[in-house]
């Protein structure tokens, strides 16, 4: 998936660094409850990364409230450069025990971990957001500035098994690798 494309673009192996991983339940706050610090919504978001609200995750992935999920936040690196940050929600009851084990114990990229259980494809982009690099906000050499944010649904057949939000960083565009058009 994204890792293979990045390796081709960068002309170098891409490594994954899992920054946060937690198995839990998709908890959807009731309408009358407000979500503050320590609320159940915090459990439905990957650490330090803006993700979709839990009710939107449930809608896109066809999940019931309380569904077993894994929340993941990773950095993808080409050499020492961080080129992408990604957050994901994976429906644990829709993947094999072997896939759950790989996701819980290794830094294997999400696409590769899920591909072992049968074809996974990106069937829908929930959103794609180009990002302007504002010089007043970002210093000229800020390689960590986002340039594109993509939110995609991962499916096996017609069944959603994951939702991933990838933030492509300026460092990806600043790489010296030669790219074919």
PLM feature segments, named:
Residues 1-181:
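Composition-driven recognition of glycine/serine/threonine/acidic- and proline-rich low-complexity segments
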């Amino acid at each position: 998936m994204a890792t293979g494309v990045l390796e081709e673009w960068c002309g170098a192996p891409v490594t994954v660094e899992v920054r946060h991983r937690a198995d839990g339940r998709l908890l959807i706050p009731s309408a009358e409850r407000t979500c503050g610090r320590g609320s159940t919504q915090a459990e439905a978001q990957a650490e330090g990364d803006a993700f979709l609200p839990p009710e939107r995750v449930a809608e896109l992935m066809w999940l019931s409230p309380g569904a077993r999920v894994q929340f993941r936040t990773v950095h993808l690196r080409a050499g020492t450069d961080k080129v992408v940050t990604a957050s994901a929600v994976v429906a644990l009851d829709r993947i094999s025990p072997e896939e759950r084990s790989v996701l819980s114990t290794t830094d294997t990229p999400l696409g590769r971990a899920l591909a072992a259980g049968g074809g996974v494809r990106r069937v829908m982009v929930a959103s794609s957001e180009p990002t302007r690099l504002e010089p007043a906000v970002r210093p000229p050499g800020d390689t960590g500035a986002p340039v594109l944010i993509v939110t995609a649904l991962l499916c096996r057949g017609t069944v959603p098994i994951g939702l991933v939000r990838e933030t492509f960083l300026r460092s990806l565009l600043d790489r010296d690798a030669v790219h074919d058009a």
